[in-house]
Amino acid sequence: MVAIIPHASFTTIKLTQKTEGSQMPTEEICKINMRTRKFDVGGNSRDFECFYSNFVQTVILLGTFFYCVERLQPWSIVTADISYKQIFVNVFVVCLIMVGLIFTKYWQHGYKSLPKFDTIYSLYLPFMVSLLFDTSSTVINTILILSVLNSYRWRTQLVVIILQLCLIFFNFEAGDRLKNIISIVINSLLSLILKYIGQLKSLDNIDSNLFSILLTNILYVSEAGTVHFRILKGIILALTTIISINYVLKKVMHFKPFMLSISFAIGLPLFANTFIHLEDGENPLLWLVKYILESTIRQKILFAWSSILILSIPSILIEKDSLSLNTSRKLWHFIIFLLIIPSFQMDSNFVKIALSGTIPVFLSIEYIRFQNLPPLGSAIELQLRRFADDRDHSGPLIISYLYLLFGISTPLLMNNSPMGLIGLGIGDSLASIIGKRYGRIRWKGTQKTLEGTLAFIVTSFIVCLVLLRFDKAAIFNHLTTLQLLTLCTLSGVLEGNSVLNDNILIPAFMMICEKLITL
């Protein structure tokens, strides 16, 4: 693994004065200072703070990586699909390529061309998640990581694609090369589309590449084995298809929004019915109704969900003006936790199927809002803007609620793990509320507080202990109390020092740590 830690300082007196006089949050100041050249011997505390927060993150990430290497013994163990030796040699080569390309850009354009420190997560998260949960796709996912160095300059894109093709040639047999070349094409297109839609504001370069790799795996790389994954893959493929068709209808045939709404309403269920492949070939909607009716537990879960949402949504909307933005947003975290945890213990497969259907539904809601499709587009825009944060306001997309849904769903769908729910529903929520209200000691280099981090660790650990004690589904029976405490502590400290979106970082890292501990 390679940690990218740029030197922290300033370039000119003018830049330093401008930075110190601004009202930018500390993490934004760090991003500017870390791209400059000269070290501030005069004692600019923010420069040291940036280095400190990046150092803490690097220690945690490298520590978990080398622990993984030590446990897997890559030079001796061979899986049924691919050798761990090949996987780690490949990631080492990718790291060297990334360092080489970054150094070349620095040589040509100076410190301003260096990527953000958070670029390290574009390497760490896809590699570790793929290695621990889908080993057979680790090599291709590691190759796809190189796309994070792509830019709008065609020369850079061409160099990255050529390097990816070379890696495919050396890592795969002739029969597998075409499939993996198609993976590169799909990932590159998805990344460019996300960057274009998000304008590198709602979704920055790191977000776009992480989500493009995730979508590439869902749509193409990973095999759709379980029912919930087949449902997720089918609906997202249907959503992608109808959005593409609507784009052509709007740009080429100049369809009005009302006609696009009709096209979307008709096309999405038709394509979903086509792309969802169940084992018995049954109609997906009829299968779902039958699946729910054949179990009283599922009917009770569905009734409980409906009742809680009917009561909570109007209440939060009514009380929104009397609550702070942060508190009103975190209430949704608590509600989702209460909705899913008890239900998951009663019927985990039903919950995973429900989440697999909910993700495309929320993506559809954002598409309707983004395109302002009648009759719901304006109403959705009005309500979602009430809970939008600064990042949502900075770009065309309202992405925070989608981040939350992806964060809680991914560990459950991939590993039957409630870590995303615990980390976001309880730990992150209380860390934010307590940190903003009572926090006094700030982590160096961020706006987050030590008090908030302690709240994250303590509350997450307590919830884990409660689930360990009363968990009928045996979710945590494979973990000891000390292991749970270690997991919560590492996650809390990393969250406190990182400026990457919590809804991405916390669930993924906690899921990785949970798996590492049990290797």
From Swiss-Prot:
GO MF annotations, alphabetized: dolichol kinase activity
Primary enzyme class: transferase
Example of a GO biological process term: protein glycosylation
CC per GO annotation: endoplasmic reticulum; endoplasmic reticulum membrane
Residues exposed to the Cytoplasmic side: 1-47, 110-118, 173-181, 245-253, 316-326, 371-394, 439-449, 494-519
InterPro entries registered for this protein in UniProt: Polypren_kinase
Keyword Membrane: yes
Source species, domain of life: Eukaryota
Chemical reaction(s) catalysed: a di-trans,poly-cis-dolichol + CTP = a di-trans,poly-cis-dolichyl phosphate + CDP + H(+)
Main subcellular localisation: endoplasmic reticulum
Lumenal membrane side: 69-88, 140-151, 204-223, 275-294, 348-349, 416-417, 471-472
Biological pathway: Protein modification; protein glycosylation
Listed transmembrane segments: 48-68, 89-109, 119-139, 152-172, 182-203, 224-244, 254-274, 295-315, 327-347, 350-370, 395-415, 418-438, 450-470, 473-493
EC numbers on record: 2.7.1.108
Membrane topology category: Multi-pass membrane protein
Subcellular location: Endoplasmic reticulum membrane
Keywords on record: Endoplasmic reticulum, Kinase, Membrane, Transferase, Transmembrane, Transmembrane helix
Protein task: Catalyzes CTP-mediated phosphorylation of dolichol, the terminal step in de novo dolichyl monophosphate (Dol-P) biosynthesis. Dol-P is a lipid carrier essential for the synthesis of N-linked and O-linked oligosaccharides and for GPI anchors.
Family: Belongs to the polyprenol kinase family.
Name this protein carries in UniProt: Dolichol kinase
Native source species: Saccharomyces cerevisiae (strain ATCC 204508 / S288c)
Gene: SEC59
